Structures are given as structure tokens and as C-alpha cells.
Amino acid sequence: TREELERELLRIVRRINPNLTTRTNTYNKPKTETDIGIVRQPFTDVDKQYWKQFGIHIDTLKKFNVFSIKYFLCNSVVRSTYKETSPMYAYKVYDKFKIYRPLASKFTKWRTNLTNRHVQGLAELPKEGGEILIITKSLKDVMCCYEMGFNAIAASSETTFIPEDILKSLRSKWKHILILYDRDATGMHKAREYSKQYKIDAFFINKKFKAKDLSDAVKVNGFNIVKDWLVNTLRKYD
């Protein structure tokens, strides 16, 4: 076998050079889970201004377990600290965290140990269900929906969808489930794919808002204007 051949070659090499040190191959070693820890702090004025531009209030952040953090750790190593020029937030989803640095580069904006089972906003839904549930692509948009009077959830990342067993359970409680993804090539493609696969209606932010998602539309156009549009758009599902 390959293992026997490797052991025999190792014995030969050691006879030739007894002082040689070798290390065991680790390519089959399973990946260890990243442990993320946080140190919370009160919301600063910078934080309040940042979330206010999306129409999201502090009480809503608290409801959805969003924290301002001094720093976070990965496997007990400090990875980043809060700065007023680069604020930092932790989304707690059940027992895991998603770190969000909105002003950082796209390479360091996110850090997460969520799995696809960690559906954002799921724990905050009314247990009895209701009329309309929106599946969107971020917790920020989930919170915008909540501020506008609608219930919403988001998958753990933009590359996954709601697990089928969770979706099945939601179908039994919600009369209408809709998809609201980004108005860009990727978002529209994935929304239509999931719409066809799961037979769920998909819709997108109106082009007139010149924004790709709900939170950006609020930032650019104002909360009440976008809320009126959303209410009117969803009226047909009443």
C-alpha cells in the first residue's frame, strides 16, 4: 500500500541520514472550527449615526443581538480592535458570531463561524408565524424589514440558502414566503434560481431607488419613501 511504501522509504532515508528530522503529513487532518470571542461595549455616537442612515434603531439592534465591540478574537488571538474611523459589530446568531466591519476592505469586512444552520433573524420571528416572511441576503436588510413592519430572515452567507428542513417548517407557519435579494447580476441570478427551485416569488428593489438592496435604498432615498414602496409592493399578498 501507499502507507507501507512511505514507511519503507522513510526507513531507508533514516539509515542514510540518522540525524534527519521528518514531519508527518497533515493533508488529511480535519479542519478545526474557528472559535470567535468578543468584548462588547456600549453603542457609541459613531455607531448610532451609522445605523441611523438605514433607519435602524438601537432597540432593533438589541433585539437582533447586534453588539458594538471593542475587539474580537479568533482562537484566542486578537484580530481587530474598534476605531471611530472603522467601527466594528458582532452579530450573535444562536451560539456563533458574525463580525462586521462596514468601513473595512472587502477582504477584512467579514469574519464568521456561522454554519448554514445559523439562519439570521430566525430566532426573532414570531413563533406562531404570520402572513408574509421575506428571505433577504443580510441581517442589515432583515432589520430594515423589521423597522418597516415586516418579518424577514437571511441565510448565514450570500452563498447559501435556507436549509430545506427549516424552509419546510417555515412554510407551515407563513402564508407567503418571498425572496428579496440584491438588484445586481449575482443577486438576481440566485434569487431566480431559488425562486424556481423552491417555488417562491422573488422581487427586487425598484430601479428608481438607484440602490441594489433595501438598506442602501433607505440610505439614498430616505426611510419613509422606501417603506411606502415596500408596503405597496407587498399589498397584493394581503
Regions found by a protein language model. Name each.
Residues 1-73, 96-115, 147-148, 160, ...:
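Non-catalytic accessory segments of DNA primases and related replication-initiation nucleases
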Residues 72-174, 190-191:
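Phosphate-handling DNA/RNA-contact segment within nucleic-acid enzymes
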Residues 128-133, 139-238:
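TOPRIM fold recognition
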